């Protein structure tokens, strides 16, 4: 996953993580779980790698942005509604947030009235971070393995037995 890759390439940086469900395998000398307040206040880069739940919707909002370091960079390739786009656009335009790299927005395809389209230092890609050759190959390999198991009479990942 993207988070695994980030942790393995950390090149001496200190990695802080926040999650209501901690994965203790990730907690190492280079990765430490902290409360959200500490993550917001200490991070130079905040990369969102989380699902969209009621407790994560709008987690990047005016209130939480005010707790961030000046000049922080925001990355999101998870779910668009994790970010209150108007609040992020205002923070980008004011310089509070230095830059944002987004692969997702709250409504896709992006609408022309999305405030992030005119915000300073905001790069938006069309929900394609999953599309590198390696990711597509992995999807094909999983599909082939699932089909083989099904044909052998030992299907995996059964949802409705």
Per-range role (PLM):
Residues 106-161:
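C-terminal helix-to-coil terminal segments
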Residues 14, 32, 98-99, 121-123:
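Conserved beta-strand segments of alpha/beta enzyme cores
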Residues 7-10, 69-70, 97, 152:
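Short conserved AdoMet
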Residues 1-14:
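Conserved anion/nucleotide-ligand pocket segment
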Residues 20-115:
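Rossmann-like adenosine-cofactor binding region
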Residues 11, 29, 118-120:
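Short, structured coil segments at secondary-structure junctions
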